[in-house]
Amino acid sequence: MTELEADPRSNILWRSVVAVLATAALIGVAVTLLHGPVASLALTGDSYQWIQHAHAAAHQPSLLLADLDTFLRPSNTWTLVVDRFLWSGFDARGYRTTSLILHGLVALALAFAGRRLGLGPVAAAAVALVWVTSPFTDESAFVVAYRFQPLLLFAWLALIVVWPRSGVSWSGGRVTLAIVAILAAAASKETWVVTPVLVAALEFDRRRSLRALAPPVALVGMAAALYIALYIFAFPTSKSYYELGSHVIARVPQQLAAFLYLGESRPYGLTVTSAGLLALGVVVLMAVACLRWRVSGTWVALSLLVLPTLPTLLVPFMPQRYLAIPYAGFLLLVGLWIGALASRFQRWQKAIRGFAVVTATLVMVAGAAIVRADLEDYRVMAAAHQVLLDEAAEVVDAVAGGRPVLIVRDERAQPLVEILREPRGMAKLPFTRHQDPYGLIDSAALFEWVLSEEGTRVDRIDDWASVCDGSEGSVVVHRDGGFADLGVISDVAAEAARWESEQRHVRVVQTVPLD
C-alpha cells in the first residue's frame, strides 16, 4: 500500500464519525429551534415537587433512593440534584435546558440503536429526527418532572447498543455496560419490569435459539420479580386508579392510529375505533413481513413498541409521555420494514427509498408544526403558573417564620381549563391539585420555590389535626387575584377544621432547616 492509498478501515471509521456528528448536529438544531423557546418559561405542575424532593436529597443522601408519593423513580431525583450543582437551584432555565439536552441525547441514542439493529446511517438518522421532532415525544422535553420517560428509553437503547450482534461474543466491558443499562432502567421508572422480555428479544435476535434465552432472561427476570415483590410490599395501595374497562383493549390500537396519523391521540375516553383497528392491521402486516423475511432486529423493535404499554393497560388515561417509547419502537419497525422492502425488491429500490425520504420529510414537517402548537399550550400553562408564583412572593414572609401556616384555597378558579378544552396542539391531561391554590402547584413546593433558601425546606403537614392541635401559627388565604395574610392564630388545627367545614380546601405547611 502506498502513502496515497487510504486504509479502508480508516475510511469506514471516518465515515462513521462524520455520520454521528452530522446526526448529532441535525438533532441539536431541531431541538434548539423547536423546543428551545421553552427554556425561558416558568416550570409547571409536578416539576416543583420533584425539585423540592431533589433539594432535600442534596442535603440528605438517603433520599436519593426514596420515592416521591409512591413513585419510585430515583434517577429523576439524581438528574435534578445534578442540576442543582450545575445551575442555580431555583432557576427554571437550568432545569429546562437539561431536559432539552436529554431529549436530544435520547434521539442520538435511538440513531445508534437503529444502526445496531441493521439500519443504514441515513435511515437511522431519519428515525432519530422523526422521533425528536414528533409531538408524541415532546411532553418530557417540555415538562421537567417527566424525565423518567426519556431516562428509561435511554437505558433501553443503551442496552440494545451494547448487546452483542450475532456471531459476537460477550466481553467484560459489554457485560458491565449491559448491567449498568439494566440498573439505569430500574432506577428510571416502574415500567422497567418488562426488561426481561426486551432481553429475550435481544438474545433471540442474536442466537435464534429459545434455549439460549434462559440464562440472561432468568437473571434479569429474577431481579424484576424481586423489584415487584418489594414494590408491592412498600406501596400496597399506591395505584388505586387502575381499573378494568374498554381502555384495556383500545390503548394499543389508538396509539398506532395516532402514529400513522389515522386518528387523534386522546389522553382519556379511550375506545376501539375503525382507525385503530386499521392501524393495528397495518402494523401487524409489517411485523409479519419482517419476521417472515427474517429481518434482524424485528423482535427488538416490537418489544419497544409493545412492552412499555403493558404495565399501563389498566390505567384509564393515556398522556403524551406514554407514547414516547412505543413511538421509538414503531419508527424502528418501519425503518426495518422499508429496508427489507428495498433489498427484496431491488428493481423498485430507488422508488421505495425515494418514497421513504418524502414520507419522513412530510412526517417531520407535520410533527414540527404540532410541536410548535404544543409549545404555545405550554406557554399558556407556564404563564398561569407564573401568576401564582408572583402572588405567593407577596406573602412569602408569612411562611418563612418557622411556625405552622394554614393555606386556605378560597377560590375555584381553573386557569388551565382552556388548554383542556381547546388545546392548540395535542390534547393534554394536566393534573389538578384541588387542595392547592388554582389547583396548580403543591403548596409546600410552591413556597419552597418562592422562598429560594438553599438550607430551608417547606414541609407539608398532612396530619395537621393531630400535629397542630393547640399549636400557634398563621393563616394565609388564597382568593382570585392573590393571597391575603390574615395573621396569627392560636390553634392551627381548629382553624383548619373551621375552614374545611365551610367547604374550603386547606393545606398546612411549615419551614424547617435541612442541615
Where are each of the predicted segments found?
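Polytopic membrane enzymes that build or remodel cell-surface glycoconjugates and lipids
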Residues: 2-515
